[in-house]
């Protein structure tokens, strides 16, 4: 229903316009208060790169964060990552991740980024506190904030927006009548716009999510996902249909697709109930970090990597690297 409202297919979005105007007024006032100096943002002693969205819902932001961290690490840059930690609840904040940190404490995306990159990761509702925690414990040269484009209390040096190339901005309205956190005109002020799928427009960086080999949660064994049989697909991400379409494109044809809410807590019994005798469960890597502790032998995940094309990605990386002292 939400997807139909935000796309403009359902006329119900008109009923939500008063709330959208209120949302737009408040969010615009917050941004303007920082722009005019009525409120002061905290500036870290190292450069800060924000990777965020203009819309609610999954746009492929986390793969971009992982891509950026890995590319900077390859250039010898010491990177730290901060996040709000959606879906997690720590005993105290800021929380600096360790190998023992669970998704229940930190949220699924921070744990995934930590496991994939090995970079220091900290979570806190106040992102400045997370930055300070990393700087106190690690000699990092740059901070990447996973989401937080609208978190103006943290000053930033680079802003990167990730756009779903198929859905783009839906009906163009602010939440809740539409998907927008800010108006599309905000793109004029960011340093880079990365478009996940669809067709990138002039000045935008095209990106595709490239699937790898399926990985068994219990053993770590790898295989072509198309070789798995009787698949039940599970996706607890911002836009589950994208994952199901990826499986189809890989030659894997699920018998059943189970969309879940983004950051949804997964209980062992609930996940186990999805799979019948002789079936194979295939999930996203973000779901896998929540399920690994109670995984069954026939549970697999399909990792994806961001693939950015054209000359702009290298120019963006050069620009970011030039900020490092």
Swiss-Prot record:
Q: Which family does it belong to?
A: Belongs to the LpxK family.
State the species of origin.
Answer: Salmonella choleraesuis (strain SC-B67)
Q: What is the lineage of its organism?
A: Bacteria, Pseudomonadati, Pseudomonadota, Gammaproteobacteria, Enterobacterales
Name of the molecule in the record: Tetraacyldisaccharide 4'-kinase
The gene name on file is lpxK
Which HAMAP family does UniProt cross-reference here?
LpxK
- List the GO cellular component terms: plasma membrane
Q: Where does the chain bind ATP? A: 55-62
One function term, GO molecular function aspect: ATP binding
The role this protein plays is: Transfers the gamma-phosphate of ATP to the 4'-position of a tetraacyldisaccharide 1-phosphate intermediate (termed DS-1-P) to form tetraacyldisaccharide 1,4'-bis-phosphate (lipid IVA).
- Which GO annotations describe the biological process of this protein? lipid A biosynthetic process; lipopolysaccharide core region biosynthetic process
Against SUPFAM superfamilies, the record matches this protein to: P-loop containing nucleoside triphosphate hydrolases (SSF52540)
Tell me which UniProt keywords the record has, alphabetically: ATP-binding, Kinase, Lipid A biosynthesis, Lipid biosynthesis, Lipid metabolism, Nucleotide-binding, Transferase
Looking at the keywords, is Cell membrane present?
no
Quickly give the catalysed reaction.
a lipid A disaccharide + ATP = a lipid IVA + ADP + H(+)
- Note the Pfam families from the entry: LpxK
E.C. no: 2.7.1.130
What is its pathway? Answer: Glycolipid biosynthesis; lipid IV(A) biosynthesis; lipid IV(A) from (3R)-3-hydroxytetradecanoyl-[acyl-carrier-protein] and UDP-N-acetyl-alpha-D-glucosamine: step 6/6
Extract the NCBIfam families matched here. lpxK
